[in-house]
């Protein structure tokens, strides 16, 4: 009986191993498809490439015959990314998580600059945002959560001149903004940027912008508002919540600030603060009548 049971267990293990191989192969193929998509940001591609290597490492436990080829292919993707985007530091080591024993309270405060651009620059951005309607893609989140966010995004690579203008103005204003937000001066590694359109029914549920290893270096979130006047939508307010951080957990307090979109204004706030975009009501549903933003994150250079 014991011998029969042993044979059955080995068979079960073999079946499990085969299923695991198939599942891992399918998962890696899916990741490779995503990494070849030009709509992914460089940081997302880097994360996916590292995930492929991680899965390839798991694959070696099964002594799969094509592991060497798989790893070489994944490493080649990383080398290609590194040469294409030298500003991204790709590390193959495991991230170190630091426990946070003390509670940190972040009030939902923000800095605001009205008339951030000249009227001519503002109008030029509105025109470009509308003209590139066909180039937007549906937004998602870093966690790929369903029904958590609805909007349309245009990445910075599609709008190089606009991106350069916004980044330069932010750099000029950053010293005074750090004081307003109670930040100590820090070396900026990158200013991430994207253009987002919210039309009828669009929203973004409560979240923060620096809640993962991938986003940990984000310090300040910014949102530049612009739209056609007279305004053809309502809603779309930003709620900025008092937030508490302790032991790698985030608590959203009930108190919040409400920020109403104002054309040609920009706001800045701590990326760790929880916030949400309320639903937009746009009766015409015309894309040109959307609530537009240039939004992004100021990253700190990490040692």
UniProtKB/Swiss-Prot annotation:
It is an enzyme of class 1 (oxidoreductase). The keyword Zinc does not apply. Residues 173-300 form the Fe2OG dioxygenase domain. Keywords: Dioxygenase, Iron, Metal-binding, Oxidoreductase, Vitamin C. Pfam families: 2OG-FeII_Oxy_3. Transmembrane segments: none annotated. Its EC number is 1.14.11.-. SMART domains: P4Hc (SM00702). Coiled coil: none annotated. Its cofactor is Fe(2+); L-ascorbate. InterPro entries: HIF_prolyl_hydroxylases (IPR051559), Oxoglu/Fe-dep_dioxygenase_dom (IPR005123), Pro_4_hyd_alph (IPR006620), Pro_4_hyd_alph_FE2OG_OXY (IPR044862). One of its GO terms (molecular function) is dioxygenase activity. This is Uncharacterized PKHD-type hydroxylase sll0191. It comes from Synechocystis sp. (strain ATCC 27184 / PCC 6803 / Kazusa).
């Amino acid at each position: 009986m014991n011998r029969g049971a042993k044979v059955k267990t080995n068979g079960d293990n073999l079946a499990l191993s085969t299923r695991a191989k198939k599942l891992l192969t399918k998962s890696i193929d899916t990741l490779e498809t995503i990494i070849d998509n030009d709509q992914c940001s460089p940081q997302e591609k880097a994360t996916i490439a590292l995930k492929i290597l991680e899965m390839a490492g798991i694959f070696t436990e099964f002594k799969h015959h094509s592991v060497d080829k798989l790893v070489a292919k994944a490493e080649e993707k990383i080398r290609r990314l590194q040469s294409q985007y030298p500003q991204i530091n790709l590390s193959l080591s495991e991230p170190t998580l630091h426990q946070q024993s003390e509670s940190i309270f972040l009030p939902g405060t923000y800095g605001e600059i009205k008339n951030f651009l000249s009227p001519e620059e503002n109008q030029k951005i509105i025109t470009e945002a509308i003209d590139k309607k066909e180039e937007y893609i549906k937004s998602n989140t870093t966690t790929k959560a369903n029904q958590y966010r609805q909007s349309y995004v245009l990445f910075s690579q599609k709008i190089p001149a606009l991106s350069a203008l916004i980044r330069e103005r932010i750099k000029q204003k950053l010293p005074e903004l750090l004081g307003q937000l109670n930040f100590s001066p820090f070396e900026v590694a990158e200013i991430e940027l994207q253009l987002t359109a919210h039309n009828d029914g669009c929203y973004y549920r409560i979240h923060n912008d620096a809640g993962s290893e991938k986003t940990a270096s984000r310090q300040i979130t910014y949102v530049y508002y612009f739209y056609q006047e007279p305004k053809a939508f309502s809603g779309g307010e930003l709620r900025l919540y008092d937030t508490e951080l302790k032991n790698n957990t985030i608590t959203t307090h009930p108190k919040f600030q409400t920020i109403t979109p104002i054309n040609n204004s920009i706001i800045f706030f701590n990326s760790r603060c929880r916030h949400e975009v309320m639903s937009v009501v746009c009766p015409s549903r015309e894309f040109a009548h959307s609530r537009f933003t240039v939004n992004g994150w100021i990253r700190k250079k990490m040692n």
